[in-house]
Structure formats: structure tokens, C-alpha cells
Amino acid sequence: MNIDKNLLEKWDKEYIWHPYTQMKEYRESKNLIIERGEGNYLIDIYGNKYLDAVSSIWCNLFGHSRKEIIEAIKNQADKICHSTLLGCGNVPSILLAKKLVDITPKHLTKVFYSEDGAEAVEIAIKMAYQYYVLRGDKGRTKFISVKEGYHGDTVGAMSVGGSELFHGVFKPLLFKGYHANPPYCYRCKYHNFKDTDERNEKGCEMECLNEMISLIEKHAEEVFCVILEGGIMGSAGMIPYPDGYIEGVAKACKENDVIFILDEVATGFGRTGKMFFCDNEELKKLEKPDILCLGKGLTGGYLPLAATLTTDEIYNQFLGEFGESKQLYHGHTYTGNQLLCSAALATLEIFEKENVIENIQPKIKLFHKELRKLKELEHVGDVRGRGFMVGIELVKDKETKEPYPYGYKAGYRVAEKLLEKGIYMRPIGNVIILVPPLSITEKEIIYLCDALYEAIKEADL
């Protein structure tokens, strides 16, 4: 289809309300319109190529136009594109559920599908709450999470989140819970570490964890869940949980009979360097989390699919006679769609055939080594992350850690310079966000980090 490029730009500004975008500024600026993708690159309507340094918002795993995933979608489309999962099965959804149970911790045995991460979290919330109701424990109406946590933009997901910037305006609509202070090592309320690296070198008493445990112990009888992101707080600015934090919370949940939900929508499928963050011995011993949320990379970033996994114990509480109305009343039109599940099956096959988790380890090591060079720059306060999820926090004053005002758009100033160098990056406030695809090459890693170094120097900060 040959459409005039100027007309596309005009219609984009005239008809589309873009997410997380100040449309006044967007309508006044030159808009980037992507036409296609090749490998790790996005290509705009003018043929310009950009390294996709945020994996199209943290979902693309193996680059764009990966033939195995596209062929799987095409082959399924030749059979059937969609039939309902309400009281009726379909082949790809069954095969994928078995596969997910096989590759996640063994105590997670049941799969509930949805189309995006926020819905996966909504389902987890409903499962946890109704579990206690069916158990006869109807007094549990609160949750516990951390301030600045992010779990999606639907009402339930916003409620258990804690982002004042994103969701503050909706507070009157949200249900109530308790929010602990986040384990934000760079801006720790208990210590004055120079940066996250210094905290990791020196260690601490984990006061943030103790605060969370105290909250769980104090409110256990009124709480139906504790929910955390898997190893790193993504939208808060790529803030890693200190080693042992999540395991400590899981232990407290087990000791106080509180369901623990781990949101790995963003962190699952290799992002933190492991297939899943919850794939560690301590959590396996505790048989936690009770509920696991997956999404984003589940289809390689090609189609919208998410999944909520849980245990036999939780699932069994929902079993009964039809008239008892114990069933989980949740489900959307495209739940368990065949095209989506086929894309996910092809994605998981790539993980197996190409030994992806083992092969990305040297690239992750190189990535973090190259990023350390940024710390010498005047306005780089902190470089932090896990695996291929990294945040670089820009500050007005490195000694005092004074942040730039939100409206100064420090991160976007760097993003504009990167775009000139053929790299697409979307920041969050003053934090440069890097979430490259797992398929990024060593050469591309070095170019990305070198270009970022220069972009920060060139930006008007």
C-alpha cells in the first residue's frame, strides 16, 4: 500500500491518542512512524533504521520478523484463528499450558490465559481474594505492595501498584492496601550510599525488608496478597530488589498464611538473565510464589498474550457443584486465542533449540561492563539493573543527587540525541531505560553503550 508520508503524519496527529504521551507536544513535533522491522532494528516510513534499545517496550526477545514465529502464526491461521476458551478447549492453548507448567517452578500447575500483563495481574488479584472467601476467610480485603511499584493500568493493577506519577489522579477510584517503602538503594532512606554499586559492595541491614516483614506480620489477618515485581522495579526506573529481599518477603508470606504474587510480566523469559526470576532454590524450597504473572515476551513480542499460573491448592478451592458459584468469573473474548498461543509455542521452541539462557550470559556481562563507563559522566548518578534490564539515572548534581525537575525532560533530551545516532530509546522521567532484545549482538552492545555515552555528553543537561 503506497500512502503519502505527509498524510500519514497528519492522520497520526489528528486521529490517534497515543499512550503515555503528552499529545500537545506530540502534535507540535516530528513524529516517528515505524513501517517495518528487521532483526533488532525498527525502520520508519522514510527507510531510517533504529536499533530497538527498549525491545518495543520490553517485549521483543529475538528481533523483528523472526521467521519461526511468523510461520507458526501463519500455519495456525490456515486452521482457525479463534474459538472461545469458555467451557471449550483448543489445541495450541493446551500445548502451551503444558509447556508453561513444565518450565516454571513445579508447584505451579494451573494456567489462566489473558491478553496483557495488567489483566494477568487482575486475574491474580481475583484468584487470591476469592481463594480466601471460598475458604471462609472473608475479612481479607487489603493487599501489601511497595510504593512506586507498577503492575499495569487497569483499576485493580493500579490499586496494587504505587506509582504516584502515573496513577495519583485515580486514587479515589482505587481499593485500599498498604505500601512499604521501596528498596531504592540509590535514594535509600536508611543509608547514604553513593550509588547502587556501593550498596552491593558494602551490604546493609536490609531495613527495607524488615519494614516489609513487619507490615506483613501486623496486617496478615486482613491481607489477601502481597505482590512484587520479579527482581526489579521496572517502571519505577529499573530499581533492582537487593539480593534476598524477595526471598525474605516470600518467607514472611509463608509464615503468615498470605498469598504471594510475583509479577514477572516484564522480567520473565530471560530478561534478568534467567528464564524466570523465581527460578531460584530459596523460592523453590518455600514453594513460592503462589501466583505467577507472565506476559510481554511470552510470544517473543509478536502478539498480546499473558498467563497467570497458580497452585493446586488455590485451584482446588474453586471446585464445586455448578450451583455453588465457586467458579472464577473472569474471561475475555480472546482468552487463550490460537494465534497467540501458537506464537508463544514457537517462542519457547527457540529458547530450547538455541540454548538462549546460556548463550546470553557473555552478552549480559559485556553489557554491564560497557555501561560502567557511563559512571564517569557528570550527570550520571546511578547505573543499575539486572540482566538486560538497566536504568541510568540522570541527576542535576552528582554530589547531592539532586534530580532534574520532571518537566525538564532530561531523559528525553538524551533520547533525541540517540535517535540521531540510529537508536530508539524511551526513558522514564530522568532515567534512561535500556532493555535490548536477547538477540542483540556484542557489536551492537558496544555501539549502543558508546552512542549513549556520547548522547549524554551532547544533551543539554
UniProtKB/Swiss-Prot annotation:
Its main location: cytoplasm. InterPro entries: Aminotrans_3, Aminotrans_3_PPA_site, BioA, PyrdxlP-dep_Trfase, PyrdxlP-dep_Trfase_major, PyrdxlP-dep_Trfase_small. It catalyses: (8S)-8-amino-7-oxononanoate + S-adenosyl-L-methionine = S-adenosyl-4-methylsulfanyl-2-oxobutanoate + (7R,8S)-7,8-diammoniononanoate. SUPFAM superfamilies: PLP-dependent transferases (SSF53383). Its EC number is 2.6.1.62. The modification N6-(pyridoxal phosphate)lysine is found at residue 296. CDD domains: OAT_like. Keywords: Aminotransferase, Biotin biosynthesis, Cytoplasm, Pyridoxal phosphate, S-adenosyl-L-methionine, Transferase. It comes from the Archaea. Its cofactor is pyridoxal 5'-phosphate. It is an enzyme of class 2 (transferase). Pathway: Cofactor biosynthesis; biotin biosynthesis; 7,8-diaminononanoate from 8-amino-7-oxononanoate (SAM route): step 1/1. The record marks 20 as: Participates in the substrate recognition with KAPA and in a stacking interaction with the adenine ring of SAM. Homodimer. PANTHER family: ADENOSYLMETHIONINE-8-AMINO-7-OXONONANOATE AMINOTRANSFERASE (PTHR42684:SF17). Catalyzes the transfer of the alpha-amino group from S-adenosyl-L-methionine (SAM) to 7-keto-8-aminopelargonic acid (KAPA) to form 7,8-diaminopelargonic acid (DAPA). It is the only aminotransferase known to utilize SAM as an amino donor. This is Adenosylmethionine-8-amino-7-oxononanoate aminotransferase. It comes from Methanocaldococcus jannaschii (strain ATCC 43067 / DSM 2661 / JAL-1 / JCM 10045 / NBRC 100440) (Methanococcus jannaschii). The lineage of its organism: Archaea, Methanobacteriati, Methanobacteriota, Methanomada group, Methanococci.
